[in-house]
Regions:
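Generic detector of low-complexity/intrinsically disordered segments
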Residues: 14, 23, 39-42, 54, ...
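Structured surface patches comprising rigid loops and adjacent beta-strands/short helices at the edges
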Residues: 92-101
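A structural detector for beta-sheet-dominated domains
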Residues: 10-12, 61, 80, 101
């Protein structure tokens, strides 16, 4: 992901359970206090109200590095959703669930 570019969510419909994405502010793999954009099961009733589905667009607003449970800094891409939430996307989720809207 590059700063200032728009990205479309893709491939979520192929998942059996985790068929949407939402901003998560908690979790077991969190070493730094930052919100993450993670896949979610849409049937799970959670405090996450706004979810992203295939075709939704986010904007990349930067890249930061955070120490993960692997004890090394990993790049996390800071994105802005259409609802105004700012969250971080891991490199693995970036490759699997996002595509550049256009160059």
């Amino acid at each position: 992901m590059r700063q200032g570019k728009m990205y479309r969510v893709k491939n979520l419909a192929k998942n059996v359970r985790n068929d949407c994405m939402g901003v998560i502010n908690h979790g077991p793999y969190q070493r730094a206090p930052h919100a993450r954009l993670e896949t979610l099961d849409s049937s799970w009733k959670a405090p996450v109200k706004d979810t992203l589905r295939d075709g939704d667009v986010v904007a990349c607003v930067g890249v930061d590095k955070f120490v993960t449970d692997h004890y090394e800094s990993q790049p996390f891409y800071k994105v802005l959703t259409l609802k105004g939430h700012v969250a971080y996307v891991s490199k693995g989720n970036r490759n699997k669930y996002f595509e550049l809207v256009r160059d």
